[in-house]
Amino acid sequence: MAAKEIHFDAEGRNALKRGVDKLADAVKVTLGPAGRNVIIDKKFGAPTVTKDGVTVAKEVELEDPVENMGAQMVREVASKTSDVAGDGTTTATVLAQAIYREGLKNVTAGANPMDLKRGIDKAVTGVIIELKKISRPIADKKEIAQVGCISANNDSEIGDLIAEAMEKVGKDGVITVEEAKGTETELKVVEGMQFDRGYLSPYFVTNADSMEAVLDEPYILIYDKKISNMKELLPILEKTAQSGRPLLIIAEEIEGEALATLVVNKLRGTLKVCAVKAPGFGDRRKAMLEDIAILTGGTVISEEKGYKLENATIGYLGQAGSVTIDKDNSTIVEGKGTEDDIKARINEIKNQVEKATSDYDKEKLQERLAKLSGGVAVLNIGATTEVEMKEKKARVEDALHATRAAVQEGIVAGGGVALIRAVTGLENVQVENEDQKTGLEIIRRALEEPLRQIVANTGTVDGSVVVMKVKEGKDDFGFNARTETFENMIAAGVIDPTMVTRTALENAASVAGLLLTTEAVISEKPEDEKMPPMPPGGGMGGMGGMGGMY
């Protein structure tokens, strides 16, 4: 086991502070509309250019092990804020640095770190209560576009596209971000329920040009087992053939005699039919088949429920306005299920999302939710170079997270104004001693820091003067760093999601509090690099006869 170094008291805390400052100073240059880019070297490929705080934070690795611990603690603030709210990572980093800096001064002067932390925690609770009071729900498409625009570093094109996508697929709809083939950024909406299973045979195609099978007003047979024997499928085929309407068969697998018979009848024109595999695997497959059944007003024919395929009637079949199937995907549009059943299923899935513990499960449940509630929007991001593409895609993903957060918890004035207004929440906080009161004052001072940094990044205005003027103002009055004017921030479209501001403050205070109450830091002792041993013998290998040279 490697030897360890132990650093106590001020020595350890100061080393941690150096690490915190190095990381925070690299991250905070990206804050606000006047924030700068950071270029990150990569071992392979072109360097990454970014203005995203968490991307910068994740790349910082310091040589000194104790400094590196401080940097990694603050990196955790940025990562956690990004995971929960999707944005606000730079604000969280700036707040963490400010709280730790102010707190460390007081600990060095003899304050009790535990009481300081208690005071900080009480202050944060008071500020968050006030933030929720001043928060207001997002009103319209324009405000969604403004949130997206601010989060994408004032790129109004991205803000408008996200607002349009949300309008088309609803607030619960799935919006995915993909790389475009060309230079144009565009929005594509897939309406209805789409799942990633195509036709089982190209002979089912109805349009040879597009290689698609299009069924108008079809019946939909949903079966959770394999179909290989034609005998069990025949009764329901005869019933649908008599109706004259097409039939889509969704089953775990259709093979052998059953598939061959379907293809032959399709080619002869006896049946308008198409067969696809059921989407998903295991329990998720059962759930998705149930979703399709509810959307189309059908029943999953399952022996577990006592239904048999040979006894199926037209009443078991789902119906839809149209179904389009290509070699990879099937899309069901205008399912004929009842609105009440679909709403009940959506609420059931929402409850499962809240209870889900893994990100993967949550993502899959959200996808099912979107498919039931109206569709999937795809943002295809175009750029001229790969470096620009990666940077733009990261900004779009940030903006998308931020707009979702705004829809969930509402919005507050941006540009650091909401935190300054939320200071009034400290007036009702009860403290037990002077050190806790100092913790309160640390938060009061730290809440000004994001605005100071936004102003500092403009490089033209004095931060203290701006902070004083904003504090004298009321409500949404603040400093718009983009135009360098004082105005109503919400009217100017400078808005932040409440969730982003709240999460940034909570995470910053949590990690800064842990750092302040640290009394010892244990790190691995760096090992001295040993010289490789000399090979035995006096001669140089491969140069025979020279061993005796002097």
Swiss-Prot record:
HAMAP family tied to this protein: CH60
Chain intervals for the UniProt region annotation (Disordered): 526-550
GO terms for cellular component: cytoplasm
Keywords from the UniProt entry: ATP-binding, Chaperone, Cytoplasm, Isomerase, Nucleotide-binding
NCBIfam families in the record: GroEL, PRK00013.1, PRK12849.1, PRK12850.1, PRK12851.1
KW ATP-binding (keyword) present: yes
Localisation per UniProt entry: Cytoplasm
Gene Ontology BP terms: protein refolding
Top EC class, one word: isomerase
Oligomeric and partner information: Forms a cylinder of 14 subunits composed of two heptameric rings stacked back-to-back. Interacts with the co-chaperonin GroES.
Chemical reaction(s) catalysed: ATP + H2O + a folded polypeptide = ADP + phosphate + an unfolded polypeptide
Gly residues: compositionally biased ranges: 537-550
EC number of this enzyme: 5.6.1.7
GO MF entry, a single one: ATP-dependent protein folding chaperone
CDD domains, alphabetized: GroEL (cd03344)
Residue positions binding ATP: T30, L31, G32, P33, K51, D87, G88, T89, T90, T91, G415, D496
UniProt protein name: Chaperonin GroEL
Signal peptide positions on this chain: none
Function: Together with its co-chaperonin GroES, plays an essential role in assisting protein folding. The GroEL-GroES system forms a nano-cage that allows encapsulation of the non-native substrate proteins and provides a physical environment optimized to promote and accelerate protein folding.
Entry similarity comment: Belongs to the chaperonin (HSP60) family.
Species in which this protein is naturally found: Chloroherpeton thalassium (strain ATCC 35110 / GB-78)
Superkingdom of source: Bacteria
